[in-house]
Structures are given as structure tokens and as C-alpha cells.
């Protein structure tokens, strides 16, 4: 056998082996990297869907929280792993803003959306001992005492930062942002009186609201939600950005083999359709989306466009969306 034929045979065997490996996926346990810390909305959603995906895949998904850098730590970590589908990124919306905020160049365009599980409802919650009964009361206090009211934050690109920036484009809101490593620690600080208010995903705080440990003074919507007043009632101008909210999804590197992507997509579609998961999501104030592939990519691009240009308008973007090729909404 000459060298050319030998090379062709070896290449064919390698390709066949790769296809067989992809079709047999998964052959061992998977790693699920959660973008934010324990107790936050992303963590809650990830830990709810993982057992159902394990059942569909027939293998364990070992979960680990790897927070930091507004999601950049986990995103970079997963991007550095082999393109075999065994490392999943269980993340939220944050990487879509890393470019405009100067955090990094890695966003979800470099990843395949296995499943956008759902999107959240945003509420503005306050320490239960504060006198505010509405967002109007909170805003009046903020404007009367510039820099004295403390807002819990998760850093640039996090949900509180994005919502605060949106509000800041339509009214003056001179607060002091106090950063935490995820919604969970921020909400703990809120209950302890270390910060005064915090915009969060309802999924992260519904139990605290129901138990009276914090009070919800507005929902980022044009319609009330379960007795929580719509923010547009006190701030009509915010309506131009609505509907808007965080989202939660499962991602792998874009160059993972197609057969592996298909296997993961099917498994998580089944998991996200499970009535127990749907009930948990809805019960925590989330809308189930359960989309993947091209449909999910279109959603991600639209969300990035709306939010990146909002940050540009608010004057907090470090880089122009136009320079990053992000089209105006």
C-alpha cells in the first residue's frame, strides 16, 4: 500500500471513529458549569433542569458553580475545554454584553445554544424595613439623596446593572451600586440591610417575597404581576424597552460535532418539557421558552441588540455596539 492510500485509509478510519464516538455520546458523565453562584436564579434553573436531562441522556451531569467576572470566568473556562460536548455552560444573558462593557470578546456567537430554557420576569425588591411602598417612593428618595441609596448589583453586564442603566436613560437615578458575586449573596445582603434595593429575576427571589423577607415594589413590565405593580405605572417612559428580561440556557462550544449537538438538544428539549420543570419555572415567575438552534440564535441576537444599544444610550458602554457589528434594534 503506497503512502497516499495508507493516508486515505487512516483518515477514513479516524473519521469513522469520530462519528461512532459522537453517535455513542455520552459514554461518561458530563460537567455542567453554572455561570453564577449558589442561590441565584441561574443556579436554581440549572439545578432544576439537570436531573431531567440526566434521565434523558442516561449519564450524570456533575454541576459546579464557577462565578466571577459577570459570567466571563465560566464562559472562558468552557471555551477552553475540548470540543466534545462533555462540558456544558449553564448560563444567563451576561456574555451578550461583555463586548460593549469591555469585559471580553467572547459572547454566545462562539457557542451553540443547546436550549434557551426560559426568560425571567424582573422585579425591583427592597429591604422590608424601608418605608417605600412604590417605585415612585424609592425614586423620590434616590433623587433627594444622591448617592446615599445603595443598590445591590452583580457587576457590569449583570441584570441589576442593565436594569439600572435602562432606568437611567429615562430619569435620574444616582445610586451607589454595591457589587456581589451573584444574586444569591446580593439578596442575603438586602435582607440584612447592607443594601437598600435590588433589581432581580423573580425566579431568584419569589420565596423571599412570599415569606415577607423582602418586599417587591415594581415589576419590569407594562402589566402587574401577581399583585406587584407594573413599573410603567410610575415610570411610563421605560415602556420603550419592554418586554425585556433575563434568560437562562444551556450551551456548548460551536464546533462540537453535529451528532453530539443533536443528542444534547433532544435531551434538553425533553427535560425542558417535563411538567415538573415547567411548574417550577412558572411558579418562580419565568416563561418557558425551550428553543434551540437557529431559533435560539435569532433570539440571542435580538436580545443583544436591544440591550447593548440601551447601554450605549445610557452612556455606560465601553465600546460602541456599532464597532462590534451589533445592529441597532
Model-derived segments and spans:
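N-terminal export leaders
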Residues: 3-9
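N-terminal signal peptide c-region/cleavage motif recognized by signal peptidases
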Residues: 17-21
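An extracytoplasmic/periplasmic, membrane-proximal ligand-sensing/linker region
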Residues: 27-29, 210, 262-329
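N-terminal (or domain-start) structured segment
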Residues: 23-110, 148, 171-197, 201, ...
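Residue-level signal for nonpolar/aromatic packing positions in well-ordered secondary structure
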Residues: 30, 39, 46, 63, ...
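Solvent-exposed coil/turn segments that connect beta secondary-structure elements
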Residues: 93-95, 119, 129, 202-203, ...
Amino acid at each position: 500500500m503506497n503512502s497516499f492510500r495508507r493516508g486515505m485509509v487512516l483518515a477514513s478510519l479516524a473519521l469513522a471513529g469520530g462519528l461512532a464516538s459522537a453517535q455513542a455520546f455520552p459514554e461518561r458523565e458530563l460537567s455542567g458549569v453554572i455561570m453564577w453562584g449558589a442561590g441565584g436564579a441561574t443556579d436554581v434553573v440549572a439545578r432544576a433542569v439537570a436531573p431531567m436531562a440526566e434521565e434523558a441522556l442516561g449519564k450524570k451531569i456533575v454541576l459546579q458553580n464557577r462565578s466571577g467576572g459577570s459570567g466571563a470566568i465560566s464562559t472562558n473556562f468552557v471555551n477552553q475545554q475540548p470540543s466534545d460536548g462533555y462540558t456544558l455552560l449553564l448560563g444567563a444573558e451576561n456574555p451578550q454584553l461583555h463586548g460593549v462593557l469591555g469585559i471580553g470578546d467572547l459572547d454566545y456567537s462562539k457557542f451553540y445554544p443547546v436550549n434557551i430554557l426560559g426568560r425571567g420576569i424582573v422585579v425591583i425588591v427592597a429591604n422590608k424595613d424601608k418605608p417605600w411602598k412604590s417605585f415612585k417612593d424609592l425614586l423620590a428618595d434616590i433623587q433627594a439623596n444622591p448617592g446615599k441609596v445603595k443598590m445591590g448589583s452583580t457587576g457590569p453586564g449583570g441584570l441589576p446593572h442593565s436594569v439600572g442603566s435602562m432606568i437611567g436613560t429615562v430619569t435620574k437615578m444616582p445610586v451607589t451600586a454595591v457589587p456581589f458575586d451573584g444574586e444569591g449573596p446580593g439578596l442575603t445582603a438586602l435582607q440584612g440591610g447592607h443594601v437598600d434595593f435590588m433589581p432581580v429575576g423573580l425566579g431568584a427571589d419569589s420565596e423571599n417575597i412570599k415569606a415577607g423577607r423582602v418586599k417587591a415594589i415594581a415589576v419590569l413590565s407594562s402589566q402587574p404581576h401577581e399583585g406587584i405593580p407594573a413599573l410603567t405605572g410610575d415610570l411610563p417612559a421605560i415602556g420603550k424597552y419592554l418586554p425585556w428580561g433575563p434568560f437562562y440556557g444551556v450551551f456548548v462550544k460551536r464546533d462540537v460535532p453535529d451528532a453530539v449537538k443533536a443528542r444534547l438538544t433532544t435531551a434538553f428539549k425533553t427535560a425542558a418539557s417535563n411538567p415538573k420543570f415547567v411548574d417550577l419555572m412558572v411558579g418562580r415567575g419565568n416563561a418557558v421558552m425551550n428553543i434551540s438552534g437557529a431559533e435560539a440564535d435569532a433570539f440571542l441576537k435580538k436580545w443583544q441588540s436591544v440591550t447593548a444599544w440601551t447601554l450605549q444610550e445610557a452612556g455606560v458602554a465601553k465600546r460602541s455596539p456599532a464597532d462590534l457589528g451589533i445592529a441597532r434594534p
